[in-house]
């Protein structure tokens, strides 16, 4: 692999790796290389044809390894079916390591490459599930200073959540953002966001995710993914007609396209908030999704948060369980419910 801890090591490795890439390019297969991580995408109309092409490519890799004096990690070398419905459970692909020496590479249902977990047929569900575990662990560590009655201010908590957590969650989103068109993927991403939002807000656990997003002023996570892809696409002029902003619009003026992108994402968010059946009590108070976004000073207390989300002051609930002497509402009603 690439020499570690050396100043000139990466540059020398690039020169060395170029020889392998030149040989593989003659195979007319797609090659992806980053440092010493190599991915070969073999195409074919049948499993036999794909395995034959992969075998020829791996033969070149093993020959190159012997020439430059590096070994191939067989434990990390796997095969995965990215397209099609071929059954490869328990199957292993035979590859020629050297003249007269045969090895095999096993098929897996998911593989991690450059920090992104890809599943069969380009599914990123395993990657999302891994993000949920990471976020829950990070939020658990921050809860010691993020309490309902005391702790850091909303602005600080919001900065932590977006700066530390959002950056990790959005990693690789330009690759798997298309998965947001599926309801299950959107719900998984929003559940990740919900964990962070609940730690930042002084509200009950039963408050809907849509209401938390508006109360905190945090764009829904699935829209954040599309936005992140559009930002990267605008830099490389790789957006298409299905994205929020196309290349033709970006060409006019970058500043205008950024403004247009923000307007469109908020239009989608506003439409969702108005059409949703959840958080209707808070919708009467905060019908504009931009309210909290544009007013960072807006930091409702625990009692105000209960009122905005429809939980009220809980006087009747507490009275029925004896902590309070009266079930009356502060507004004058004999019973607060």
Swiss-Prot record:
Catalysed reactions, as listed in the record: DNA(n) + a 2'-deoxyribonucleoside 5'-triphosphate = DNA(n+1) + diphosphate
GO MF terms, alphabetically ordered: endonuclease activity; RNA-directed DNA polymerase activity
EC number: 2.7.7.49
One Pfam family per UniProt: RVT_1
Region (Nucleic acid-binding endonuclease): 253-337
Classification via PROSITE patterns: RT_POL
Domain Reverse transcriptase: 1-118
Keywords: Endonuclease, Hydrolase, Nuclease, Nucleotidyltransferase, RNA-directed DNA polymerase, Transferase, Transposable element
Domain of life, source organism: Eukaryota
Protein name: Retrovirus-related Pol polyprotein from type-1 retrotransposable element R1
């Amino acid at each position: 692999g690439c020499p570690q801890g050396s100043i000139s090591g990466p540059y020398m490795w690039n020169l060395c790796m170029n020889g392998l890439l030149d040989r593989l390019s003659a195979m007319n297969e797609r090659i992806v290389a980053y440092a010493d991580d190599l991915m070969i995408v073999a195409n074919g109309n049948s499993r036999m044809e794909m395995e034959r092409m992969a075998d020829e490519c791996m033969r070149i890799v093993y020959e190159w390894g012997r020439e430059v004096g590096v070994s191939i990690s067989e434990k990390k070398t796997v095969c995965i079916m990215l397209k099609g419905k071929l059954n490869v459970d328990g199957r292993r692909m035979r590859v020629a390591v050297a003249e007269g020496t045969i090895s095999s590479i096993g098929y897996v249902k998911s593989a991690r490459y450059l920090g992104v977990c890809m599943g069969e047929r380009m599914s990123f569900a395993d990657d999302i599930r891994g993000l949920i575990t990471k976020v829950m662990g990070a939020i658990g560590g921050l809860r010691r200073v993020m309490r309902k009655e005391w702790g850091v201010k909303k602005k600080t908590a919001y900065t932590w959540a977006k700066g530390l957590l959002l950056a990790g969650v959005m990693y690789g989103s330009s690759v798997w953002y298309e998965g947001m068109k599926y309801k299950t993927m959107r719900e998984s991403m929003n559940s990740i966001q919900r964990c962070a939002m609940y730690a930042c807000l002084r509200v009950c656990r039963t408050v809907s995710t849509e209401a938390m997003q508006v109360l905190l002023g945090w764009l829904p996570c699935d829209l954040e993914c599309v936005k992140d892809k559009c930002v990267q696409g605008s830099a490389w002029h790789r957006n298409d007609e299905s994205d929020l902003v196309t290349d033709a619009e970006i060409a006019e003026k970058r500043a205008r396209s950024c403004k247009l992108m923000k307007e469109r994402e908020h239009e989608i968010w506003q439409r969702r908030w108005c059409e949703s059946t959840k958080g209707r009590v808070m919708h009467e108070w905060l019908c504009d999704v931009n309210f909290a976004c544009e007013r960072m000073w807006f930091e409702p207390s625990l009692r105000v948060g209960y009122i905005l989300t429809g939980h009220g002051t809980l006087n009747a609930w507490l009275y029925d369980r004896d902590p309070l002497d009266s079930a009356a509402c502060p507004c004058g009603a004999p019973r607060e419910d």
